[in-house]
Amino acid sequence: MEKILREKLVNGQFSNAPALRSKMMRALKGANTKSTEQKFQKALIDAGITYFQVNAKLIGNPDIFFPFYHVVVFLDGCFWHGCPKCGHVPKSNTSYWRTKIERNKERDIQKRLILHEQGYEIVEYWEHELKEDLSRCVKLLANIIEDNLIRISSYAV
Protein backbone atom coordinates (compact mmCIF):
# COMPACT_ATOMS: atom_id res chain seq x y z
CA MET A 1 0.00 0.00 0.00
CA GLU A 2 2.82 2.39 0.90
CA LYS A 3 4.43 1.77 -2.50
CA ILE A 4 1.20 2.68 -4.27
CA LEU A 5 0.92 5.87 -2.24
CA ARG A 6 4.50 6.91 -3.03
CA GLU A 7 3.97 6.30 -6.76
CA LYS A 8 0.93 8.57 -6.79
CA LEU A 9 2.56 11.36 -4.79
CA VAL A 10 3.48 14.20 -7.15
CA ASN A 11 4.84 17.45 -5.68
CA GLY A 12 3.51 16.47 -2.27
CA GLN A 13 -0.01 15.79 -3.60
CA PHE A 14 -1.77 12.74 -4.98
CA SER A 15 -2.35 12.64 -8.69
CA ASN A 16 -5.58 11.03 -9.84
CA ALA A 17 -6.90 10.82 -6.27
CA PRO A 18 -10.32 9.26 -7.13
CA ALA A 19 -8.71 6.36 -9.02
CA LEU A 20 -6.23 5.81 -6.19
CA ARG A 21 -8.99 5.96 -3.58
CA SER A 22 -10.99 3.43 -5.58
CA LYS A 23 -8.01 1.07 -5.80
CA MET A 24 -7.30 1.39 -2.09
CA MET A 25 -10.93 0.77 -1.14
CA ARG A 26 -11.03 -2.38 -3.29
CA ALA A 27 -7.95 -3.64 -1.46
CA LEU A 28 -9.64 -3.41 1.95
CA LYS A 29 -10.96 -6.70 3.21
CA GLY A 30 -13.39 -7.08 6.08
CA ALA A 31 -12.32 -9.32 8.91
CA ASN A 32 -14.71 -11.01 11.31
CA THR A 33 -17.67 -8.99 10.04
CA LYS A 34 -21.19 -10.23 9.53
CA SER A 35 -23.42 -8.56 7.05
CA THR A 36 -26.98 -7.64 7.86
CA GLU A 37 -28.12 -10.40 5.50
CA GLN A 38 -26.05 -13.04 7.28
CA LYS A 39 -27.36 -11.97 10.67
CA PHE A 40 -30.94 -12.12 9.41
CA GLN A 41 -30.41 -15.57 7.87
CA LYS A 42 -28.95 -16.85 11.13
CA ALA A 43 -31.88 -15.38 13.08
CA LEU A 44 -34.31 -17.16 10.72
CA ILE A 45 -32.55 -20.49 11.24
CA ASP A 46 -32.43 -19.95 15.01
CA ALA A 47 -36.20 -19.34 14.92
CA GLY A 48 -36.74 -22.59 13.01
CA ILE A 49 -37.53 -20.86 9.72
CA THR A 50 -35.72 -22.80 7.04
CA TYR A 51 -36.27 -23.93 3.45
CA PHE A 52 -35.18 -20.58 2.09
CA GLN A 53 -32.78 -19.82 -0.72
CA VAL A 54 -30.28 -17.03 -1.10
CA ASN A 55 -29.06 -15.78 -4.48
CA ALA A 56 -32.24 -17.04 -6.14
CA LYS A 57 -32.37 -16.43 -9.86
CA LEU A 58 -35.48 -14.28 -9.69
CA ILE A 59 -36.03 -10.85 -11.16
CA GLY A 60 -34.91 -8.16 -8.73
CA ASN A 61 -32.47 -10.52 -6.97
CA PRO A 62 -34.29 -10.90 -3.65
CA ASP A 63 -32.01 -11.45 -0.66
CA ILE A 64 -34.07 -14.40 0.59
CA PHE A 65 -36.57 -16.56 -1.28
CA PHE A 66 -39.04 -19.07 0.12
CA PRO A 67 -40.06 -21.06 -3.00
CA PHE A 68 -42.78 -23.18 -1.39
CA TYR A 69 -44.48 -20.18 0.23
CA HIS A 70 -44.03 -17.82 -2.75
CA VAL A 71 -42.39 -15.23 -0.49
CA VAL A 72 -39.43 -13.03 -1.44
CA VAL A 73 -37.56 -10.86 1.05
CA PHE A 74 -35.57 -7.74 0.29
CA LEU A 75 -33.15 -6.40 2.90
CA ASP A 76 -32.54 -2.88 1.64
CA GLY A 77 -29.52 -0.85 2.67
CA CYS A 78 -30.67 2.57 3.87
CA PHE A 79 -28.08 4.45 1.79
CA TRP A 80 -28.32 2.54 -1.50
CA HIS A 81 -32.11 2.31 -1.60
CA GLY A 82 -32.91 5.79 -0.28
CA CYS A 83 -34.51 5.09 3.09
CA PRO A 84 -36.88 7.95 3.96
CA LYS A 85 -35.89 7.73 7.64
CA CYS A 86 -32.09 7.62 7.52
CA GLY A 87 -30.95 7.60 3.89
CA HIS A 88 -28.87 10.58 2.85
CA VAL A 89 -27.10 12.02 -0.18
CA PRO A 90 -23.34 12.57 0.24
CA LYS A 91 -22.11 16.16 0.20
CA SER A 92 -19.59 15.48 -2.57
CA ASN A 93 -20.81 14.71 -6.09
CA THR A 94 -24.39 15.29 -4.94
CA SER A 95 -26.06 15.22 -8.36
CA TYR A 96 -24.47 11.85 -9.21
CA TRP A 97 -25.58 10.26 -5.94
CA ARG A 98 -29.08 11.75 -6.05
CA THR A 99 -29.58 10.37 -9.58
CA LYS A 100 -28.05 7.00 -8.64
CA ILE A 101 -30.27 6.53 -5.58
CA GLU A 102 -33.41 7.66 -7.44
CA ARG A 103 -32.64 5.15 -10.23
CA ASN A 104 -32.21 2.43 -7.59
CA LYS A 105 -35.59 3.30 -6.07
CA GLU A 106 -37.32 3.27 -9.48
CA ARG A 107 -35.70 -0.05 -10.38
CA ASP A 108 -36.79 -1.55 -7.04
CA ILE A 109 -40.40 -0.53 -7.67
CA GLN A 110 -40.41 -1.95 -11.21
CA LYS A 111 -38.83 -5.29 -10.26
CA ARG A 112 -41.09 -5.76 -7.24
CA LEU A 113 -44.17 -4.98 -9.29
CA ILE A 114 -43.20 -7.76 -11.70
CA LEU A 115 -42.69 -10.20 -8.80
CA HIS A 116 -46.07 -9.20 -7.35
CA GLU A 117 -47.72 -9.81 -10.74
CA GLN A 118 -46.08 -13.26 -10.78
CA GLY A 119 -47.83 -14.07 -7.50
CA TYR A 120 -45.03 -13.54 -5.00
CA GLU A 121 -45.59 -12.04 -1.56
CA ILE A 122 -42.98 -9.30 -1.16
CA VAL A 123 -41.47 -8.49 2.22
CA GLU A 124 -39.17 -5.50 2.55
CA TYR A 125 -37.01 -4.51 5.49
CA TRP A 126 -34.80 -1.46 5.80
CA GLU A 127 -31.32 -2.01 7.18
CA HIS A 128 -32.12 0.14 10.23
CA GLU A 129 -35.21 -1.97 11.03
CA LEU A 130 -33.08 -5.10 11.17
CA LYS A 131 -30.49 -3.41 13.35
CA GLU A 132 -33.09 -1.92 15.70
CA ASP A 133 -35.24 -5.03 16.27
CA LEU A 134 -34.15 -8.17 14.45
CA SER A 135 -36.46 -10.48 16.41
CA ARG A 136 -39.51 -8.37 15.50
CA CYS A 137 -38.59 -8.62 11.81
CA VAL A 138 -38.24 -12.41 12.09
CA LYS A 139 -41.65 -12.69 13.82
CA LEU A 140 -43.34 -10.57 11.15
CA LEU A 141 -41.85 -12.74 8.42
CA ALA A 142 -42.93 -15.91 10.25
CA ASN A 143 -46.51 -14.59 10.33
CA ILE A 144 -46.43 -13.79 6.61
CA ILE A 145 -45.10 -17.26 5.79
CA GLU A 146 -47.81 -18.85 7.94
CA ASP A 147 -50.51 -16.77 6.22
CA ASN A 148 -49.18 -17.79 2.81
CA LEU A 149 -49.11 -21.45 3.84
CA ILE A 150 -52.79 -21.21 4.80
CA ARG A 151 -53.58 -19.48 1.49
CA ILE A 152 -51.63 -22.07 -0.53
CA SER A 153 -53.28 -24.94 1.39
CA SER A 154 -56.75 -23.56 0.67
CA TYR A 155 -56.00 -23.60 -3.08
CA ALA A 156 -54.90 -27.23 -2.90
CA VAL A 157 -58.22 -28.43 -1.46
Regions found by a protein language model. Give the residues of each.
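Nucleic-acid endo/exonuclease domains
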Residues: 1-157
